[in-house]
């Protein structure tokens, strides 16, 4: 994707801030449903990072697999849990929380120190991808689509039916 410099920079800053806010939401929100939705925001932002580098198939696969399957499964599992179990004997601050905060703060400080001490001027930033690589990516994703819709159509549909039956079975077992 050939974007002008300021738009490309704005997109990266926007997606990076979405990643940071979503990650903080996963860690800091006490309601597990809200944490799962924040994890979905993180997955969406990660998949959107692939679009400026002309990896559209990877972005679509990331959205389908992580947001469409894994995050929905996490939300599904959290919704079937008893919400009152989370709030019984809720201590405001424990020793484990203190140790975790010290470890995370030290990792964060070392990361910031590394970022500030790195010479970023020697890194070559590329904004346009090579046309040969772009053509290979397009042909590979087209080949995957052709194989899924012709050679592997029956196994692909059988797997989707098996997953649907497993999901219906899980719902039936959870309701009993």
UniProtKB/Swiss-Prot annotation:
**Regions that span the bilayer:** 10-30, 32-52, 61-81, 93-115, 152-172
GO CC annotation terms, alphabetical: chloroplast thylakoid membrane
- EC numbers: 7.1.1.-
Q: Which InterPro entries match?
A: NAD(P)H-Q_Oxidoreduct_6, NADH_UbQ/plastoQ_OxRdtase_su6, Nuo/plastoQ_OxRdtase_6_NuoJ
Q: Which GO terms describe its molecular function?
A: NADH dehydrogenase (ubiquinone) activity; quinone binding
One matching Pfam family: Oxidored_q3
This protein's assembly is summarised as: NDH is composed of at least 16 different subunits, 5 of which are encoded in the nucleus.
Which family is it part of? Belongs to the complex I subunit 6 family.
Protein's name in the database:
NAD(P)H-quinone oxidoreductase subunit 6, chloroplastic
The species this protein belongs to is: Vitis vinifera
């Amino acid at each position: 994707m050939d974007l002008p410099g300021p738009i490309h920079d704005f997109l990266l800053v926007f997606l990076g801030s979405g990643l940071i806010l979503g990650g903080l939401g996963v860690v800091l929100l006490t309601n597990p449903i809200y944490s799962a939705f924040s994890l979905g925001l993180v997955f969406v932002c990660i998949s959107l990072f692939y679009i400026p580098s002309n990896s559209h198939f990877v972005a679509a696969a990331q959205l389908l697999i992580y947001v469409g399957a894994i995050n929905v499964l996490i939300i599904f599992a959290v919704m079937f849990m008893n919400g009152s179990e989370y709030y019984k004997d809720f201590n405001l601050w424990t020793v484990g929380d203190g140790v975790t905060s010290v470890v995370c703060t030290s990792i964060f400080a070392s990361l910031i120190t590394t970022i500030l001490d790195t010479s970023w001027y020697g890194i070559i930033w590329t904004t346009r991808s090579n046309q040969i690589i772009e053509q290979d990516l397009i042909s590979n994703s087209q080949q995957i689509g052709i194989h899924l819709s012709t050679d592997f159509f029956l196994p692909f549909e059988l797997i989707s039916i098996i997953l649907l039956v497993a999901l219906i079975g899980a719902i039936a077992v959870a309701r009993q």
